[in-house]
Swiss-Prot record:
Pathway in which this enzyme or protein is active: Cofactor biosynthesis; coenzyme A biosynthesis; CoA from (R)-pantothenate: step 5/5
Protein family: Belongs to the CoaE family.
The name this protein goes by in its record: Dephospho-CoA kinase
GO molecular function ontology, one term from the record: ATP binding
Amino acid sequence: MLDLLKISVTGDPSSGKTEACQVFEELGAFVISADKVSHSFLVPYTSEGQRVVDLLGPEIIVENTLNRKAIAKKVFGNRDLLLSLEKILHPGVCRFVEENYTQVVQAQKYSLFVVEVPLLYEIQYADWFDRVILISADTEIRKERFLKKTGGSDTSFDLRCARFSSLEEKILRADVVIENNGTKEEFRHKVKQCFKALKGTI
């Protein structure tokens, strides 16, 4: 049985990673969002959730779940707390991804295995994947998207971006770079072309 190509989609905040993954999923790929997996741990009764409460305090518990806005307020702008939070969540995310890969290969029904990992290089996870796709967009365009989607502030955008390594460094390391400065239709077309190229390498 041939192994399924492992693809990571990464990029800076609001670059278009999720949209790219949606296109891949529409075309028959199995897709995992690392952020969604980490968010699933943010409940008090998981081992990760309890460690997050121990780290940040019981005030982050709201209606029997861990309030992501309260967590963000505490960790963005405090690098030590942010790194400690990542050390709690990321091992579980990687474990989930790798366990799912084994199951998806056995299912033999998907064209690619795609994982959206925003902090791929920052957590040293790139080597596990066969290909890395970097989604790139100008800072002002990304900021506009972020503000429109979240209703957040320029400061909250800047604080999130501060955790990411430089775009130039990631461009040098990625296998494929897809620019997303134009329309949604233009971007989706580029992702579809990328999918075809990846399928051609199998």
